[in-house]
Swiss-Prot record:
Belongs to the UPF0266 family. The keyword Transmembrane applies. Signal peptide: none annotated. It comes from Listeria welshimeri serovar 6b (strain ATCC 35897 / DSM 20650 / CCUG 15529 / CIP 8149 / NCTC 11857 / SLCC 5334 / V8). It is a multi-pass membrane protein. This is UPF0266 membrane protein lwe0739. The chain crosses the membrane at residues 8-28, 46-66, 70-90.
């Protein structure tokens, strides 16, 4: 087993992916106070994930069976494939509402920084802060009503 640049890159990518999963699924629900509401959102760009998992699978198959590449590289590619299968197929994007703000796309946005909110006809809640625009794609009308109720209560 050799630790060449490819294997080091794959190891770092796997560690960062594990940290992302832990932060998103374990830290965010506990951080910044009590969770008031967690809403699963409609997924966007699902095909990007499928393509990425397919590329990782092709690299794994190519390295393992056709090139008979290093075993460590195959193991790291397999681990990366499993991690991204979890991210793409089993995990869904969500908005986590706390008493002081909300987590969306791994970032915390305090309610005090929200300048404007708009609701589109197709169920997209657009939240404008002083720096960026957040687009929350609600899965159902019930989820949208729950989000709006939290905003009216804590804002």
């Amino acid at each position: 087993m050799t630790w060449d640049a490819t294997n080091i890159f794959l190891l770092v990518a796997n560690i960062l992916t594990i940290l992302y999963i832990l932060y998103n699924d374990a830290v965010i629900p506990l951080w910044k106070g009590k969770t008031v509401l967690t809403v699963k959102l409609r997924s966007r760009g699902r095909w990007d994930g499928y393509i990425f998992v397919g590329i990782i699978a092709l690299l794994f198959i190519s390295n393992t069976f056709f090139r008979e590449g290093p075993q460590l590289t195959s193991i790291l590619l397999a681990v990366m494939g499993i991690l991204f299968i979890y991210i793409c197929f089993f995990r869904s994007s969500k908005a986590v509402f706390k008493e002081t703000g909300l987590f969306y796309a791994l970032l915390f946005f305090p309610y005090s920084k929200i300048e404007r909110m708009n609701l589109s006809e197709d169920g997209i809640l657009v939240i404008e802060t002083n720096r960026q625009r957040l687009m929350l794609f609600a899965r159902s009308e019930k989820d949208l009503e729950k989000m709006l109720a939290v905003f009216t209560k804590y804002n």
